[in-house]
Amino acid sequence: MLRLGRSAASEVSSIRNSLQLQLEQRGARPMQCAYQTQSHSNPEGAKRGRSPMSLAVMGAAALSVGLELQTDGIAQARAAMEPGTQLQRHKWQLFDQIGAGAFGVVRLGMHEESGEVAAVKIVPLENPNDQRSYPALEREIAALKLVKALGGHNSIVDLRDVYVEGRKLFLVTELARGGELFEQIVAYGSFPELKARDVAREMASALSFMHRHGLVHKDVKPENILMSARVVDHNSGVYRKSNRHESSSLVKLADFGSAGPASVNTNLEDIGTAAYLPPEVLNSGLCTSACDMWALGCVLYIMLSGSHPYDLDGMSADSVVEHRVKSEPVTFDFSAWDNVSPHAKDLISKLLVKDPTLRLTADQMLQHPWMNASAEAAAAGLRRPSPLLAGQPIPISPA
């Protein structure tokens, strides 16, 4: 996975004002990423009047069949760009590296005309014998293009551009300036319940959108949920947006390298992270939309307590975690849960049900009482203060 560093959380206005100055001080010029506009018309996918469901079926078929591996990485990358919606090609200036991963780096990019700042993942395609990155790269491009063809979702990272230049592939997505949800939890601790609910609602909405169109993320975890805005005061739940390019959403689901249709006999190397896999995947390789809901239950547990539901101290061996996932119920019997509402615990319990057929779907999660309390009721009821602190009389039973 490509992890964005904390520098990505800088306000875009500061980035824009300082980038050219930094480069001039270094005596460097920004790299020009010119990509000549080409016609990649797909009459079946781009035809006017194509229904979202037709696009979904087409996209799911492309994902399930997969794109043929070529001995030349360039040819393979070009093939990966063919399915899906037509994207407008632009020139991007590349600046400082803001992240790195197993298969490439992420650099800050700026659109030459609009000034939009984006995250540019750069994947070298120089070694045709190293095929490890290609399937994940193909899945990510196909999934992001399918989401875009379906109209996109405010809580799913948006694909801005994808092109090949030289022997490198450039994948341009919107920049989530607040960094990873994981980093926020590490830096600031567990979330206030109301803010955790906001994140959970957006993620459930994003997954509902994907699942309706036959797409399963297969790697939902705090590292793959990006914050749209910089944290100002985590304890009070205050976030700052600094620019007109800021998204109206709080979070963005990212990293679609494992995404695809539901699958059976799934190769565990092609999906998710072991700590977030549900029992049915570990037992039989069955990976459906229910897998995403299990993982989201783990994420919500972590947001509210700061601990993983099956690895409370973060020190357990994978085999121990796997045993607990398969056989032990989720528990809330430590102090971090003392002030968390019963509704929140009930929702998590229904997401971490062992039987995938009984697990809440994304739509059912959105209808859960914890998700639908009004702001006033939630503020009064999700964390119940002592009657004395609330200035309320305490009834005293006669002796």
From Swiss-Prot:
Q: Where does ATP bind?
A: I98, G99, A100, G101, A102, F103, G104, V105, V106, K121
Q: Which organism encodes this protein?
A: Phytophthora infestans (strain T30-4)
Question: Region annotation Disordered: residue ranges?
Answer: 30-50
UniProt KW keywords: ATP-binding, Kinase, Nucleotide-binding, Serine/threonine-protein kinase, Transferase
Q: What does this protein do?
A: May regulate an early stage of the zoospore pathway.
Residues annotated as the enzyme's active site: D219 (proton acceptor)
- Any one Gene Ontology molecular-function term assigned to this protein's record: ATP binding
Q: What is this protein's name?
A: Serine/threonine-protein kinase PKZ1
Family of this protein: Belongs to the protein kinase superfamily. CAMK Ser/Thr protein kinase family.
| Gene name of this polypeptide | PKZ1
SMART domains cross-referenced by the UniProt entry: S_TKc (SM00220)
Which residues belong to any copy of the Protein kinase domain?
A: 92-371
Please give the catalytic activity noted in the UniProt record.
L-seryl-[protein] + ATP = O-phospho-L-seryl-[protein] + ADP + H(+); L-threonyl-[protein] + ATP = O-phospho-L-threonyl-[protein] + ADP + H(+)
EC class, as a word, reads transferase
- Enzyme Commission number(s) from the entry: 2.7.11.1
UniProt keyword annotation of Cell inner membrane present: no
InterPro entries in alphabetical order: Kinase-like_dom_sf (IPR011009), Prot_kinase_dom (IPR000719), Protein_kinase_ATP_BS (IPR017441), Ser/Thr_kinase_AS (IPR008271)
